[in-house]
Amino acid sequence: AAVRASPDLLGSRGEDTASDGSVVWAKPYTFRAPPTPGQNSLQRIIVFGDMGKAERDGSNEFANYQPGSLNTTDRLIEDLDNYDIVFHIGDMPYANGYLSQWDQFTAQVAPISAKKPYMVASGNHERDWPNTGGFFDVKDSGGECGVPAETMYYYPAENRANFWYKVDYGMFRFCVGDSEHDWREGTPQYKFIEECLSTVDRKHQPWLIFTAHRVLGYSSNSWYADQGSFEEPEGRESLQKLWQRYRVDIAYFGHVHNYERTCPLYQSQCVNADKTHYSGTMNGTIFVVAGGGGSHLSSYTTAIPKWSIFRDHDYGFTKLTAFNHSSLLFEYMKSSDGKVYDSFTIHRDYRDVLSCVHDSCFPTTLAS
């Protein structure tokens, strides 16, 4: 591909053309270079999971498994001018070993991915297959073992077979985990996650986001509730202390095909009674399930846990808008109409993040 970009500051527009230098193979696409780490500008991020793919006439779909997929895709195409980057957190085409389904998916999202960075995470339908080094010994990937996902999309991992990486995007740092490999304390992934969370400069990048496909945090999905843990087995037992110690603002998950948001949580307890606005000292992480991208919907438990603030059994996606270093807006929108059905704001200074609460500060002595 031939790439031409303005020599000005990052954030300028460029052009990408597929060619060999003499013959142009496809129409040119324009793109905007990303903001530098810490750059103070309007930054808008879309996050969702489990979208899948579909056809307008349904001619090649089995049982209409991802009925909301086209609505989500269409809505994001219509709204291209109002966001800057996309995070699709696992379960992309549900190809399950049929490579033609990857072609269908990439064609469906091409109007988005040709113009916006399209970041991806590994889900069970990309990676899982018995005896291949994954954490789950199931056949959800249809034998893909992560290879098509690693090949189709770029992500800045040191080892592309390990689908964990970080993204510095302006005032945000995203620590993207791989829930299909072992994340527990003592593993290489746990070491990466701690390094990713601990090395961010919160004065310049105040918005710290963790994401993974399976629910390593909290969900009132019926099958998690039946287990009594409201999480993937062993999901948060190791990671929770990292989210708490390093003050993760929002932890995102997919896998469960619906939407749910928690209150700010510390040790499974709500630490803020407000539901729509959070300010001052940062003392808990908000957990979001955004798995309603398009695949068949998942059910909730009948009893609503105290930490569950908002649930929606429908297809949708979320949007983060950072206005500056101290103001963040979160929105959840339905794919059917693009309207906002849940939202909250965060307003705080970086010193509110650094203030010691709970066990977030390391012990010190007079000598230190």
Curated annotation (Swiss-Prot):
MF GO annotations: hydrolase activity
Disulfide bond among keywords: no
Compartment list: Plastid, Chloroplast
The protein's enzyme class: hydrolase
UniProt keyword Transmembrane, yes or no: no
CDD domains attached to this UniProt entry: MPP_PAPs
GO CC aspect terms: chloroplast
Keywords recorded for this protein, A-Z: Chloroplast, Glycoprotein, Hydrolase, Plastid
Processing after translation: Glycosylated.
Record EC number: 3.-.-.-
Quaternary data: Monomer and homomer.
Summary of the function given for this chain in its UniProt record: Hydrolyzes pyrophosphate, phosphodiester and phosphosulfate linkages of nucleotide-sugars, sulfonucleotides and nucleoside di and triphosphates. Highest activity observed with the substrates ADP-glucose and adenosine 5'-phosphosulfate.
Name of the featured protein: Nucleotide pyrophosphatase/phosphodiesterase
